Amino acid sequence: MAAGSGGSGGSGAGPGPGPGPGGGGGPGSSGPGLGSGGGLGGGGELHPRTGRLVSLSACGRTARRQQPGQEFNHGLVLSREPLRDGRVFTVRIDRKVNSWSGSIEIGVTALDPSVLDFPSSATGLKGGSWVVSGCSVLRDGRSVLEEYGQDLDQLVEGDRVGVERTATGELRLWVNGRDCGVAATGLPARVWAVVDLYGKCTQITVLPSEPGFSPPTPVPTPPLEPLAPPEDSALLEQGTSVDEAFMVSPAQARPETFPNSLDSHNDFASMELSEVVSNAILSAYNGGLLNVSLSSPPAGDGLASSGPATSPILTSNDALLFHEKCGTLIKLSNNNKTAERRRPLDEFNNGVVMTNRPLRDNEMFEIRIDKLVDKWSGSIEIGVTTHNPNSLEYPATMTNLQSGTIMMSGCGILTNGKGTRREYCEFSLDELQEGDHIGLTRKSNSALHFFINGIDQGVATPLTPPVVYGVVDLYGMAVKVTIVHNNNHSDRLRRNNAILRALSPEGALRRAAPAAQAEPERLLFHPNCGQKAAITHEGRTALRPHATDDFNHGVVLSSRALRDGEVFQVRIDKMVDKWAGSIEIGVTTHNPAYLQLPSTMTNLRSGTWMMTGNGVMHNGTTILDEYGHNLDRLKAGDTVGVVRREDGTLHFFVNGMTQGPAAWNVPPGVYAVVDLYGQAAQATIVDDVEVPPVSEPLPEGNNQMSPSSPSSAAGGSDLRFHQLHGSNAVITNGGRTALRHNCRSEFNDAIVISNRALRDGELFEIVIQKMVDRWSGSIEAGVTAIRPEDLEFPNTMTDIDYDTWMLSGTAIMQDGNTMRNNYGCDLDALGTGARIGMMRTAKGDLHYFINGQDQGAACSGLPPGKEVYAVVDLYGQCVQVSITNATGPMDNSLATSNTATEKSFPLHSPVAGVAHRFHSMCGKNVTLEEDGTRAVRVAGYAHGLVFSTKELKAEEVFEVKVEELDEKWAGSLRLGLTTLAPEDMGPGAGSGPGLPPSLPELRTKTTWMVSSCEVRRDGHLQRMNYGRNLERLGVGSRVGIRRCADDTMHILVDGEDMGPAAAGIAKNVWAVLDLYGPVRSVAIVSSTRLEEPEGTQPPSPSSDTGSEVEEDDEVEEQGLRGQNQVGIVPTALEFLENHGKNILLSNGNRTATRVASYNQGIVVISQPLVPHMLVQVRIDFLNRQWTSSLVLGVITCPPERLNFPASACALKRAAWLLRGRGVFHNGLKICEKFGPNLDTCPEGTILGLRLDSSGGLHLHINGVDQGVAVPDVPQPCHALVDLYGQCEQVTIVSPDPGTASGKIAGTQGDMEKADMVDGIKESVCWGPPPAASPLKSCEYHALCSRFQELLLLPEDYFMPPPKRSLCYCESCRKLRGDEAHRRRGEPPREYALPFGWCRFNLRVNPHLEAGTLTKKWHMAYHGSSVAVVRRVLDRGELGAGTTSILSCRPLKGEPGVGFEEPGENCAPPREEQPPPVLLSPSLQYAGAEMLASKVQFRDPKSQRTHQAQVAFQVCVRPGSYTPGPPSAALRELPDQHFSPSELEWVTKEKGATLLYALLVRVE
């Protein structure tokens, strides 16, 4: 046979000479010629007439759709000339966008483009048009074939697609050089190619045919034997007959001989021989091991023969699917390609499915196992049957069928239900896992073959009936399978590797001696990897996609053997915290192509060396125990590597540093292996040139990667943009450049983030390279603590409401809220070439740099020890940025300098936060300095008005310090609140629209002010003799203003609250000051939050959860000490590295996890416990398999050198522990029934320990102090946690600012404070944690809450959530272990807990708290009615009074106490005697219907009618009441626990009661 090599003429087919220069059959050839053509095959250029949005270029060979961001159609192009038969019109996709759905459509049309009226899309072509759209074939716009070929919508840039009209009038589609089969028949003789640049496809280019490749019309092919070269004999081994040997698929013209060298003159110069072989095998495999004839030859050509070898191949394109008729428990989906057994945990059979049509000869029927369950024995069975599914009565299992059925079950073959081959193959179907593939094919010689993961298992039976259907039995463990078609790219790759694994090395690795030294092949991961692993990014990245579901089966190997001295290095990209253990690395002699990969490489017993943890293992046996750095402690961004030296020694690297020789006499030719085990979820190969060797290790620290940082010794930085980004962003230039495509049609969705977390003091700097003037707004930059893998990219980063800090324009935003305006730089004002940098300091401050200049601290308080990533939003005008060379670590002095911090945050600010600023609108004599934190009156005595930059929030304090006085003037500083927005005032000189000269004249909007000791509203006197006289302020005096939640204005002088100055303050008010008279200069000393002094701080919600116990006297003494004493708040608590052997630390040593057994889980806080420091841990996970739970305590011996026992109770020296409800010292119980039972604390509970000033150890639960557990604890001591029994994970949490100090918590009003009586106190004192408490689902609690909301009571009367309420229903009280009665007061008196009620805790005014809420007061209840609840709350006590205890403001309407100026000689009003108040220590009596009337209401949720009662829980001053018998007529005593003579208390004294809680009961 002559093989012609054609030029532009293409390929000729048929006897006789070939046409011109084209290749054809030579004269006298015995068979048809097989040419290899070039050229375009007709219609090489596009017709100049196109759709209205198409522009042509490159001599009519490139077409581009204009305005791709606004339009998705009108992109039709046609070939210039009609197609010639047998020639493929091929185009390459040059560009796609993500804005639309749908993509390129291609086909042919009989319509002449010269006269065609172009429709908007190809589907609108009529009059003889065939178009392939997606995976459907349409004729004149109507679908004629579904599930055809490859889905065109899935093609990417660079893919090639073409159409061909054959000589027989068939339409064929070609995708990337592969024939997809016949798409249509009966085409006219004259058709033009048509391409629609639709949807995502925006640009294509017409391609010439590739050299040496021609897609001819299917031609008869002579028998294989004369063509089989000697080199192919190895491919026909292993029992493969001659007529089963492969032939080249129609997608490739077969070369006359396989090359025996890779010289440049050979057409295969760019391919390795093994690739040629494997592609040829794959082509034959995908073609079903083709018959001798590809189509029926013409009569009389001498090629016809009898038998299967000459039978014509079916040309039907019916997709192989599951038949709609199936087993009774089968559910079909995915267009009948997926079958799933219903109720897999209840039933194990009735799961038979069959194919929708008979199998063709050599057709592969392959399925993938999608889901298995572990309940049953046995698993999937697969085979063929002669029974037609339409007439078959499906059996429970196919092995019950006694005729016409061949099944593979386990590792054997069953024929008609009886075993015919017991050991058919070495694989058992019962051992296959999810993701494995099983296939079968009936060969043309009637032999049946099964395939497992692409590997042919040989002949199962030599004789198979000619008409058989594929059948699958989803039996036992098998639940779900999916049919896999051969056109799936990943399946092709997998099968290719599987076939190569089955081949012998000699057959697959034939190499010719290279003539010259070739460039070394790049190291990649081999595609054959573990079951739970995947290879991405062209073989450079390996990952476990479901890393949180499984911890092993993540083994990956290098694609080739390592050369001597060649370093194989990977970077850890992603880690998870769920598992123990981490990445393992090493080498193996096993070729990855033939290796059956184990679940973990340490299970391999031959030819393997692995570094695991800090040890080295050879063939599964440890050979070095203490070697190098512990791999289990590496973090994301660290690198590990391995190298085999020429002398046979094996060395490992961690972050570029050699760990020394690990093994000797390692043979050459080993493959690198990485085991993505446990926490390691993703790793990427790093070339030697990308990470230079690190010269010397850096000291470890909390904020450094261990043991050294990859970029610390390099001149450049490894910081890049992450591969994950917003939908409109594009990452180029090796990850150093980010741009927003469609920049004139899209302005957002272009967020990019750094590829790793920033280190402390490390600068991330970008340069703006391109901008457009179309939009408003520009680049936004900042940091986020959200990992890129966990970030669901929003439209803009300011949409994220957690763990994110951004600079937008001049505004600093945290979690989407503006924290401050007028920062030192304006990002919206930057242009092309400007550089923006961001850096987190070691102190937790965020600094921005503009063109290298530090702009000062933007915000502080970034979470210590928590990773933050740089994030850039290419928003609005900013289109493109690149990372600069300045990115990397900066000088340490800059990272820790206080100069920039002082500029933005005054050092005397009580709380670190965003400091207040003065608004730029101010009086004409005022100058603002120090970034708006200092105001100076430069002339005169007036025109000194200044405003806050933003509105004051509820309870926010705006405070200034007097810096300069000018004694020649009289008067005082004036301050107050105004509804006038400063930006609404224009510049003026004291009249008209400008600012007035003094604050009393500011009357355009409502203004409240204090001047000297007078309170004025809009200049009118409201009150005299208020607080301290402001005329007496001196240099250093502090004065502040607060808008309270009860709509009152308070003035603070030197931290002391002067009480309410005015009421009825509007919601939106600004602070206003008048630098009048002697006060010349003030400076802001407040932040957006104020740490209040002891005496003025309201009760913290954290202490009002339900505690019934009063603190000791020492707590009150603390409250009388200096007001400036601040509780110590730890900044970076972490667990000590020395811990129990079953402990794994993570999250910067802030999370401890017990990874095995139930003990050996002791951890110690590394920092000593000092007085007033609250150390808290949160219970993250409980394992109900065990009993008991965590143990808390302190130890006074040095923990660094302590050998921890199995449990904390075994500590016999210097240990004080809290376990269950007991207190233990050195293993001996010294107190029982202390506080709540720690064994019953649910997940989410926060437990804390604190030392008071006298050394007493306090236990805190969910922020509530449980009292002194151990007095006089020696110091120094360390907090200890034992993760015992159920408790498997805890995390250190930072305390709330208000509760870090013991004295603060101690002076807060508890809900029900009672004394320690015989060491016993109520166990209800810890409330449910906010997120994980089982009480969250209490229906009774929710019902009572809905009723309380119906009362429409002001929220300010009640404690804020989550300390707002406590439920005493049967289930909730039993869960807490509440006792029915408690004792309280001096002398002690018993009272009953409000069982059956729900308690809503009331606020108590801080001024009255110290004088009234003492441990000497008793607790009682008062039955009430809904009608009087609001009146009682307004008064603040049950008896009539003139002062509201809740607000300390005079009641409205009472004489002599209004805000109007009183007369000079007014006599005080006569007070009325309050009526007697009935109380009871028992709520069963106080809540009786005659004392607490019932009211009917409809539940808004369920619409059911209920009855409800209300009552008050009050504190009663001892001696102010008279006990006696019940006055209400009762049939029997409601509470037998109390004596009848003391069941009712009566008091007439004013101020004898203090409201504590509102109680609600619903029937």
Curated annotation (Swiss-Prot):
CDD domains: SPRY_NHR_like. Disulfide bonds: none annotated. GO terms for cellular component: centriole; mitochondrion. Residues 43-209, 319-486, 522-688, 718-886, 915-1087, 1132-1295 form the NHR domain. Ubiquitinated; undergoes HERC2-dependent 'Lys-48' ubiquitination. This ubiquitination leads to proteasomal degradation. Residues 1107-1117 have a biased composition (Acidic residues). It is found in: Cytoplasm, Cytoskeleton, Microtubule organizing center, Centrosome, Centriole. Gene3D superfamilies: 2.60.120.920. InterPro entries: B30.2/SPRY_sf, ConA-like_dom_sf, Neuralized, NHR_dom. Residues 1-49, 692-717, 1087-1121 are annotated as: Disordered. Keywords: Cytoplasm, Cytoskeleton, Phosphoprotein, Repeat, Ubl conjugation, Ubl conjugation pathway. SMART domains: NEUZ. Pfam families: Neuralized. The modification Phosphoserine is found at residues 504, 909. Promotes CCP110 ubiquitination and proteasome-dependent degradation. By counteracting accumulation of CP110, maintains normal centriolar homeostasis and preventing formation of ectopic microtubular organizing centers. PANTHER family: NEURALIZED, NEURALIZED-LIKE PROTEIN 4. Interacts with CCP110; this interaction propmotes CCP110 ubiquitination and degradation via the proteasome pathway. Via its interaction with CCP110, may indirectly interact with CEP97. Interacts with the E3 ubiquitin-protein ligase HERC2 and UBE3A. May interact with MAPK6 and hence mediate MAPK6 interaction with UBE3A. Interaction with UBE3A may be indirect and mediated by HERC2. This is Neuralized-like protein 4. The gene is Neurl4.
